[in-house]
């Protein structure tokens, strides 16, 4: 059987007759949260039967989750082949001011999705890398994470959702499928998530950054930098031996970005390694001429990690130096400190799970992880 979520609307129109049925199916899946083909009552019964024999649109289900006191939720999903991946829901508040000056606050959601089962980049601070790469996710398996999280958290269709390709795996190592997922997600008759609300995060595959730019998808770009010298970055991130800092910066300078947007540089701050004012000075020089925003991230220690969480004073001093020298800089609000927040943690803690391939779980059936 084939995963219906792997298909763009135009692809579905090409294989269905009459083709307007494709839009109806898209609306049932992405707007009306249908659980099966039998619910699609405006389709002929024989068509529903045939579709059910050829397609499925439930490529994953949740076998465990952890909910933090700050509202963030981390999910462990099982795929049809028994492999598992992680996704995270980050709820936040968005403040809006209307023409009359009235202030309102609305829920805003960011969903962090995986693009691969495992990862081959080998970053020393990442748990996922320790297991290596098993396989790429299909477009539908990527889309399925967002669909499942939106559905089970009752996020209204019209509510703004941001998507970040920052979970397990290197998105640009699975560029074709990630690009197709971006196209499926932006479909107006589907989830209608604008590319401007989708961010692709990469460890710095220079050639693939160029290819992504040439696709002109309109997405935002985030670079996992984490160090300002090639010596340290090569130690932390072996990919730097193939694409060093200078090569990454060259690729970024050629990436098409909306005039109102900036390239995000993720900088994981590790105590005593990359948290000094000297590092901040070097970073300012590296970013010269780039419309950049730096996001400082507290290292989130995992069991067996040799690295430590930085001090708040050091984070603030680093941030202040960047701001004083014209670089937009934020400190990412730590989420999920009381759960398995680091990439790969929940999966590691759940190695003994034996999920069924039958996607029958409902929100009430999900096993909440005991911290």
From Swiss-Prot:
Positions of the catalytic residues: 86, 343
Region spans: Disordered: 348-371
Span of domain Radical SAM core: 105-338
Cofactor detail note: Binds 1 [4Fe-4S] cluster. The cluster is coordinated with 3 cysteines and an exchangeable S-adenosyl-L-methionine.
BP terms from Gene Ontology: rRNA base methylation; tRNA methylation
Catalyzed chemical reaction(s): adenosine(2503) in 23S rRNA + 2 reduced [2Fe-2S]-[ferredoxin] + 2 S-adenosyl-L-methionine = 2-methyladenosine(2503) in 23S rRNA + 5'-deoxyadenosine + L-methionine + 2 oxidized [2Fe-2S]-[ferredoxin] + S-adenosyl-L-homocysteine; adenosine(37) in tRNA + 2 reduced [2Fe-2S]-[ferredoxin] + 2 S-adenosyl-L-methionine = 2-methyladenosine(37) in tRNA + 5'-deoxyadenosine + L-methionine + 2 oxidized [2Fe-2S]-[ferredoxin] + S-adenosyl-L-homocysteine
Cofactor: [4Fe-4S] cluster
Keywords: 4Fe-4S, Cytoplasm, Disulfide bond, Iron, Iron-sulfur, Metal-binding, Methyltransferase, rRNA processing, S-adenosyl-L-methionine, Transferase, tRNA processing
GO molecular function: 4 iron, 4 sulfur cluster binding; metal ion binding; rRNA (adenine(2503)-C2-)-methyltransferase activity; rRNA binding; tRNA (adenine(37)-C2)-methyltransferase activity; tRNA binding
Regions of compositional bias (Polar residues) in chain numbering: 348-363
Cross-referenced Pfam families: Radical_SAM (PF04055), RlmN_N (PF21016)
Cellular compartments annotated: Cytoplasm
Recorded GO CC terms: cytoplasm
Enzyme Commission designation: 2.1.1.192
InterPro entries in alphabetical order: Aldolase_TIM, Methyltransferase_A, RlmN_N, RNA_MTrfase_RlmN, rRNA_lsu_MTrfase_RlmN/Cfr, rSAM
Chain residues that bind S-adenosyl-L-methionine: 169-170, 201, 224-226, 300
Ubl conjugation listed as a keyword: no
Disulfide pattern: 112-343
Record family assignment: Belongs to the radical SAM superfamily. RlmN family.
Its job: Specifically methylates position 2 of adenine 2503 in 23S rRNA and position 2 of adenine 37 in tRNAs. m2A2503 modification seems to play a crucial role in the proofreading step occurring at the peptidyl transferase center and thus would serve to optimize ribosomal fidelity.
Further comment: Reaction proceeds by a ping-pong mechanism involving intermediate methylation of a conserved cysteine residue.
Protein name in UniProt: Dual-specificity RNA methyltransferase RlmN
UniProt organism field: Campylobacter curvus (strain 525.92)
Gene that specifies this protein: rlmN
């Amino acid at each position: 059987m084939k995963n219906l979520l792997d298909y763009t609307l135009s692809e579905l129109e090409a294989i269905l007759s009459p083709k307007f049925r494709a839009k109806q199916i898209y609306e049932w899946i992405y707007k009306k949260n249908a659980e099966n083909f039998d619910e699609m009552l405006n389709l002929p019964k024989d068509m529903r039967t045939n579709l059910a024999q050829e397609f499925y649109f439930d490529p994953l289900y949740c076998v465990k989750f952890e909910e933090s006191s700050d509202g963030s939720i981390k999910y462990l999903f099982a795929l049809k082949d028994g492999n598992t991946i992680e996704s995270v829901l980050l709820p936040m508040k968005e403040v809006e001011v209307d023409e009359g000056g009235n202030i309102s606050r609305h829920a805003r959601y960011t969903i962090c999705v995986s693009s691969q089962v495992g990862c081959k980049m080998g970053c020393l601070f990442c748990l996922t890398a320790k297991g290596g790469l098993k396989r790429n996710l299909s477009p539908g398996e990527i889309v399925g994470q967002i669909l499942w999280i939106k559905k089970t958290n009752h996020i209204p269709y019209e509510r703004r959702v941001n998507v970040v390709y920052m979970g397990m795996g290197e998105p640009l190592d699975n560029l074709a499928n990630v690009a197709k997922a971006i196209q499926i997600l932006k479909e107006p008759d589907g989830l209608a998530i604008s590319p401007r609300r989708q961010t692709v995060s990469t460890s710095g595959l220079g050639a693939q950054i160029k290819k992504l730019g040439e696709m002109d998808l309109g997405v935002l770009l985030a670079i996992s930098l984490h160090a300002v010298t090639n010596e340290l970055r090569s130690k932390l991130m072996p990919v730097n031996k193939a694409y060093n800092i200078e090569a990454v910066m060259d690729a970024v300078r050629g990436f098409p970005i909306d005039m109102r947007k900036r390239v995000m540089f993720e900088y994981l701050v590790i105590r005593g390694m990359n948290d000094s004012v000297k590092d901040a000075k070097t970073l300012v020089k590296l970013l010269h001429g780039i419309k950049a925003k730096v996001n400082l991230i507290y290292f989130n220690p995992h069991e067996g990690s040799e690295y430590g969480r930085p001090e708040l004073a050091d984070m603030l001093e680093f941030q202040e130096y960047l701001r004083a020298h014209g670089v937009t800089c934020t400190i990412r609000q730590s989420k999920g400190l009381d759960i398995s927040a680091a990439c790969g943690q929940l999966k590691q803690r759940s190695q003994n799970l034996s999920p069924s391939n039958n996607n029958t779980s409902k929100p009430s059936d999900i096993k909440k992880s005991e911290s």
